[in-house]
Amino acid sequence: MSPSIKKLDCFSPMLCHCKVACTNSTISLMFGCKKYRHQDEDTGSPQEPSSPQFTDDTPGPELVQVAEKSLSQIENVHGFVAHSHISPMKVESLECIFDGPSPVVKEESPPSPSTPLSNPYPQSPVSVQANPPPVVVNTESLDSAPYVNGTEADFEYEEITLERGNSGLGFSIAGGTDNPHIGEDPSIFITKVIPGGAAAQDGRLRVNDVILRVNEVDVRDVTHSKAVEALKEAGSLVRLYVRRRKSASEKVMEIKLIKGPKGLGFSIAGGVGNQHIPGDNSIYVTKIIEGGAAHKDGRLQIGDKLLAVNSSCLEEVTHEHAVTALKNTPDVVYLKVAKPNSVFMNDSFAPPDITNSYSQHMENHISPPSYLSQPLPPVHSGRFSPTPKTTVGDDDVTREPRKVVLHRGTTGLGFNIVGGEDGEGIFISFILAGGPADLCGELRKGDRLVSVNGIDLRGATHEQAAAALKNAGQTVTIVAQYRPEEYSRFEAKIHDLREQMMNSSISSGSGSLRTSQKRSLYVRALFDYDKTKDSGLPSQGLNFKFGDILHVVNASDDEWWQARQVTAQGEVEEMGVIPSKRRVEKKERARLKTVKFNSKSREKGDNPDDMLSKGQSGQEEYVLSYEPVSQQEVNYSRPVIILGPMKDRVNDDLISEFPDKFGSCVPHTTRPKRDYEVDGRDYHFVVSREQMERDIQEHKFIEAGQYNSHLYGTSVQSVREVAEKGKHCILDVSGNAIKRLQVAMLYPIGIFIKPKSVENIMEMNKRLTEEQGRKTYDRAMKLEQEFMEHFTAIVQGDTLEEIYDQVKQIIEEQSGPYIWVQSKEKL
């Protein structure tokens, strides 16, 4: 019979940081390993033998409100933040990162978050050779034949000895009999080798290696937690017996290419951090451009692996490094290439582009300026991912008139036109992504419209061309002629006209822009804006995303502002029109009224479309639009608060990959110190409960709560100490902590991971049921609604890797020393 557990009272039900303690099987995880937290993933963990057992006579963990009456000024105060190195184990996870020293486990300390930090292995010189030459494991010494998915001849075996460093062993694992990683194979797989860690420095352990034994412990056919335990308890010197599939035979050859007008004429993908094939950091050829040097030579093929270019090695390098090496070559280029075995020689069997990355066209710097580029799917910053490829050059497009047939859709024909003055012609200036013109693929920016359904537009005015297109019916036959040079001159003229128009008074009306008495200010956008979806623009609009900084150079008009975007590199030259605060709020309130009218049967709060508004019934809705900001210099590393699904995986990876840049703080507690604990290392032990309650009332804590009659909390001072040491303090807290840190002048970087859908969540965590995925999604939507204006940025992605790359980029951009903070200026 299951032991009874006292129900927890969570002070922030929306985030429920204590949910991990709400089932019998997870009591031991409440203050210990928090690699994957249940408020993110809603999955139960199997009962572990080590989990504390409670009976009816033994009270379970209880989280109760602290000094209820005296804490009225503190909203949603709950929980506490473990300061551990984001625990070096993932008991309830599919994947574990061994990124910290082996811990000392004390029987009496389930609530101690500091336990995993204790390192029983002194960092003194070790006389034993840490990295001996590879040896082949005598598989006859194993109790039984290794689990083999394939024949014995397909595999090779190696013994690897690693010395556990300050950042642990430096690799991640997945698998086990309870959580097979690949199909039904129960093996323990290496899923990640962390740069800079012990495994990476040794250089022999590879992604997809299978661990057979850790020291003398057999980890074949064991549960995930048993493998974790074996690695944790292995000591400072860890001997790993691993199995890996033998590399397919490759033929290495040298290819000499002479650059032509189209450069080398091929595209690449892959590299460290942007693997084209999971587990493989190689640089692969993904496209041979017709007519280019590689195509004419005929030897380079899709699927070939680039080993070197001239004297520059391309093995184990980033995508950006490979791009630079290929760009900086002379006219004669020598490529060292590995040809795969015959099974891959046919293009239909080429290694799949698993990551859907966009490879770089090597020689796009040689091509003339292109006006053909269509809107590309979003990609990560160039530092973390490949840049988009250029698929076609101007020379490939005919300059002769061509016939294009479009079928009008809900978005019209899906393109914008400009021109029509003094017989200059009508040009396509923009093609809407996903619209009929885009899907057709035969029209492009820079096309001149010759006729529409037989109506000659060569001498038409703008109004005549617009009328012809509007009245053309559902099926529209267009004759277009590509004229990039004419359009280029025309675009320069448009820019000059736009500047004149933006700085002068335009005729009054609903689309007017009054520009008398210019007013300048800086704002942070609290919503996404797509100019193509705003029909009332009086002039060229300016796209922006949530969190972007905008320099509003003219805010004198009630409806429209003129603005430029501000990036980390400075202010962008392009100026455009954006909706004013008043216009945004007016349109959003009108939309919300329509939503409510059409959704009366829905219960309050159930509508995910209400994300932009806040407020109580009977009051005018508070709509997020812009926040006034000013630039400020900081001399500390900003704390980092990540909220939303998968946040714990991201937190763990940040500390694992960059232990010198990210850290965690020491919490406070009123619990008596145990013999093995050190004040200031494991906890700050507060002398009296009364003292800590006073500190809470005086807002010295960003979050606090009670466990087993003892108070736990994270103080502002603890966070400040980490920040002033030059490390970003990773905080596992609620959104309320963002506001408290801002008040304390410790401006955190708040990042919200916004799931695209329930399916998106389930794809990133395949253990979730649909119901659990739905709950996780609903929690994320409520989280966004509650704290949206406090987020520095919002990230979305199809994979965890994509999200992680975005988070790293945001933290880098927002690290300072100059940051934008909320100002008191009135909008």
UniProtKB/Swiss-Prot annotation:
SMART domains named in the record: GuKc (SM00072), MAGUK_N_PEST (SM01277), PDZ (SM00228), SH3 (SM00326)
Every PDZ domain range: 159-246, 254-341, 403-484
Example of a GO MF term: ionotropic glutamate receptor binding
Domain of life: Eukaryota
Cellular compartment(s): Membrane
Membrane topology reported for the UniProt record: Peripheral membrane protein
Pfam family, one: PDZ
A GO biological-process term: actin filament organization
Keyword annotations: Membrane, Repeat, SH3 domain
SH3 domain location: 518-588
InterPro entries: DLG1-4_PDZ_assoc, DLG1-like, DLG1_PEST_dom, GK/Ca_channel_bsu, Guanylate_kin-like_dom, Guanylate_kinase_CS, P-loop_NTPase, PDZ
Coarse class of the protein's main subcellular location: membrane
Polar residues bias locations: 44-56
Family matches, as PROSITE patterns: GUANYLATE_KINASE_1, GUANYLATE_KINASE_2, PDZ, SH3
Family listed: Belongs to the MAGUK family.
Name this polypeptide is given: Discs large homolog 1-like protein
